[in-house]
Amino acid sequence: MTTRRDFIRQATLLGAGLSMSPFFINATPGSVGANDKIRVGLIGCKGMGFSDLQAFLRNPEVECIALCDIDDEVLNSRAAETQKITGKKVKNLYKDWRKLIDNKDIDVVIVGTPDHWHCLQMVAACEAGKDVYCEKPLGNSIEECNIMVRAAEKYNRVVQVGQWQRSDPHWQDAMAFVHSGQLGKIRTVRVFSYQGWCPSIPVKPDEPVPAGIDYDMWLGPAPKRPFNRNRFHFTFRWFWDYAGGLMTDWGVHLLDYALYGMNVTAPNSIMASGGKFGYPDDACETPDLLQTIYTFDDFTVMWDHAIGIDDGAYGRNHGLGFVGENGTLVVDRSGWEVIPEKVSGKARMEAVPLKKAYGEGGLNLHVKNHLECIKSRNRNCNASIEIGAHIAKFSQLGNIAYRTGKKLTWDGKSFHDTEADKYLCKEYRAPWELPKI
């Protein structure tokens, strides 16, 4: 079963801005020697961003020299926590994320903000000569992901996306078994996330912006709306302006392994069905129940999520089942096993009993992998920018099929459907502009 640790998905707040131009004069790309200190700055300190920073600080070569958040209370409390961890006062505290990126002493920027900010901040960091650890999902639209890949390539930056399961050894062991061919031909991959812990979000009235929060900069490129606590902090992910619901949250982690296991990046067609069936009257916009079928040449990937229900498939509340002719490999964050297929009572292969998760934890290993790649200037991280883009776009395809209610075909660039194609790119609120790379 998934522990509360797995659900650290609180909304991460943003750096506030003074200048209205989001980009910078190109910086000379920096390099970090094998024995050099690696100086990091974090944008978005509330939730997963701070967990990422803590993982960085477990490595002796890392020094945190800057924090940025639009919420004074969050910024000051995280600065105190960081000082307690390191024994040193954080040198620079910002409410303007662009000032952090413009700090020439910073080698690595951690982007821990809500999804709708990832593209602007990651591209600006690359342009300024920083390497980047960007939380998942990589982008909030398909076009944003394409732009981010081009930026990392253009500025030759080492980017790791926060899909830390890519560095978790038991997941890698499971994929090695899938790739061994012992399961036989795989006909479908069942991917599921049932989150019974997640409650209904009651409708709340709009209210004045709390003191110490720059809400206009929290919105950034998203549409202008009155302040509402339901659209802020952790629950931002249930609103289309800022994120894509459980599909782009847990879906990015789990569907990523469907792509990895099957050695694919994009489907031929997608269809989806679902809705707000568990909590029909709550404040959320994204579906609390969704089934999506991605069709490839000779197999399917099926996504199934439900909020407020904890019993999924194979006795688990999340995971994947690679369904082969000889057996099914089931994997989740607790471990993996193989269930044989039986014909006339005879097993087609030997069962593999549960192989439990092991090691120091995927997030710690993921950050170590990033640091090693930074030192060696190897852009092929465990969750490289390309890997992050593939799965972020894959998840977006499912959401677009749901929102249009259509079976869609996909050629890698377009649906060739006017209604569906309008979802390929987000419209940015002025004065923010989609980066041109």
Label every model-predicted segment.
Residues D131-Y133, G139-G212:
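A contiguous active-site-proximal alpha/beta segment in oxidoreductase catalytic domains
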Residues V40-I43, C64-C68, I110-G112, Y133-C134, ...:
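Structural recognition of the beta-strand scaffold that forms the well-ordered cores
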Residues D69, K88, G112-H116, G139-E143, ...:
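Alpha-helix capping and helix-loop boundary segments enriched in small/acidic/polar residues
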Residues D173, K185, R190-F192, G196-W238, ...:
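Contiguous beta-strand/loop segments that form the cofactor/metal-binding neighborhood of enzyme cores
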Residues G33-N35, D102-N103, E127, A152-K154, ...:
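Extracellular/periplasmic catalytic domains that process cell-envelope and extracellular macromolecules
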Residues L57, I101, A152, V178, ...:
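Hydrophobic residues in alpha-helical segments
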Residues D71-V74, Y94, P114-H118, L138-N140, ...:
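Short, solvent-exposed turn/loop segments enriched in Gly/Ser/Thr/Pro and often Arg
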Residues M1-C134, E143-V158:
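N-terminal glycine-/serine-/threonine-rich beta1-alpha1-beta2 phosphate-ribose binding loop
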